[in-house]
Amino acid sequence: MDRMFGTDGVRGIANTELTAQIAYNLGRAGAYVLTEGAHKPKILVAKDTRISGDMLESALVAGILSVGAEAVILGVVPTPAVAYLTREYNADAGVMISASHNPVEYNGIKFFNNKGYKLSDELEDGIQKVIESDFEGVPSPIGIDLGRERIEVAALEDYTEFAKQTIPYNLKGMKIALDCANGASYKSAVKAFRDLGADVFVINDNPDGTNINKNCGSTHPEELMDYVVKKGCDLGFAFDGDADRCLAVDENGKLINGDFILMLCANYLKEIGKLKDDTLVVTVMSNLGLDIACRGFGIKLEKTKVGDRYVLEEMTKDNYVLGGEQSGHVIFLDYNTTGDGLVTALQVASIVKKKEKTLSELCSVMKELPQVLVNATVPNDKKNIYLEDTEIVEAIKEIEAKLNGVGRVLIRPSGTEPLVRVMLEGENQAEIDEMAHGLANLILSKI
């Protein structure tokens, strides 16, 4: 069997690729593998707003109960709430049912260990081995030893209170727009900002099971960009479906991506003496403009492979406190063990208030190099063709020579979809756009 787990859990089209049977198997194997000691294990289960969440939750919970574990149902809460509440409630593990920013037909199952971290590859492989062994040695308790399901009604409130306490100021006097992507943040984000005194304007906070991420949220921020200007807001935030990431919009309606957010937060933490070793952890996809800006502030960058799990690994290795991705996954390790869209939004808003400057002013210290990202749809078994085909390899070398050190080519297979991402950076937008599309078309012609 191929590896079940991708870069962000098990993901696929719900009911064909990610079936109720697979969810049951993951619940049963996961509860068994992640339980330490002889006590009755407690596993938290949450979901985003997509229609398939009910089906997968029912199956997953059945699997958990079948090995005698307790399933604590959190309902619809953001992914980072699961990471936080797993620690807060002293659970053995947490599970989030979500496909994050993917369209509604997708769903996913992602595990957290008892410390709120995503699982290591070894633990994921251990879960898969149990499933492949047809649950050899896994108990099937009967009678009073079976597991029970319990609904935790305070989950959303507990997470929201935690997020609010990560900033030292209230937000009175600020006008803030939120795009909740019809996803998991539709209650918590609005409540947190209103409780802190902000004047809040909200769009896409009416999930119906089918409209998550649909032309909204961090993958489609255009509506929010217009809305911020229309309502005269100081800034806005767009979350993705499970709210583990967010992007910002300044008062002029300009999109502020994760690179700018990281620069802003790193610079502020350095100023107040809280940026460990003056170091920020980012991925190879971060813009070269971030390197230049951070150098000017005396901030060092550690770079990892793409994926917030690799950022987190680097952060925990050396106890760095801030890291993230251009896509808006930002990890504040002093507060949470995963990317947290609400915590990120609150940090940015509090910095804007503390500095008494507009978001556009605060971001003007960084200049982005033009960057083009083109997705080429490639079957999973052909994702490495860019490394193996001599014509593609030569084309990449030619582009790098043309860029002459001011720019770069980065090709990355997606860990969750049948895509290869072709990214070019350089000084001339039109030139790199043409080269990126040419390279993507060359890759497509070879499959």
Swiss-Prot record:
> What does the UniProt cofactor note say?
Binds 1 Mg(2+) ion per subunit.
SUPFAM superfamilies noted in UniProt: Phosphoglucomutase, C-terminal domain, Phosphoglucomutase, first 3 domains
Q: What is this protein called?
A: Phosphoglucosamine mutase
Describe the family membership recorded for this protein in Swiss-Prot or TrEMBL. Belongs to the phosphohexose mutase family.
Q: Which residues carry this modification: Phosphoserine?
A: 100
A GO biological process held by the record: peptidoglycan biosynthetic process
- Please give the Gene3D superfamilies that the UniProt record associates with this protein: Alpha-D-Glucose-1,6-Bisphosphate, subunit A, domain 3, Alpha-D-phosphohexomutase, C-terminal domain
Recorded superkingdom:
Bacteria
- Cited Pfam families: PGM_PMM_I (PF02878), PGM_PMM_II (PF02879), PGM_PMM_III (PF02880), PGM_PMM_IV (PF00408)
Q: Which cofactor does it need?
A: Mg(2+)
Q: Which UniProt keywords apply?
A: Isomerase, Magnesium, Metal-binding, Phosphoprotein
The protein's matches in InterPro entries, at most eight in alphabetical order, are given as: A-D-PHexomutase_a/b/a-I (IPR005844), A-D-PHexomutase_a/b/a-I/II/III (IPR016055), A-D-PHexomutase_a/b/a-II (IPR005845), A-D-PHexomutase_a/b/a-III (IPR005846), A-D-PHexomutase_C (IPR005843), A-D-PHexomutase_C_sf (IPR036900), A-D-PHexomutase_CS (IPR016066), Alpha-D-phosphohexomutase_SF (IPR005841)
Q: How is it modified after translation?
A: Activated by phosphorylation.
Catalytic activity reported:
alpha-D-glucosamine 1-phosphate = D-glucosamine 6-phosphate
Active site: residue positions: 100
Q: Which GO terms describe its cellular component?
A: cytosol
Listed EC numbers: 5.4.2.10
Primary role:
Catalyzes the conversion of glucosamine-6-phosphate to glucosamine-1-phosphate.
Q: Does the keyword Transferase apply?
A: no
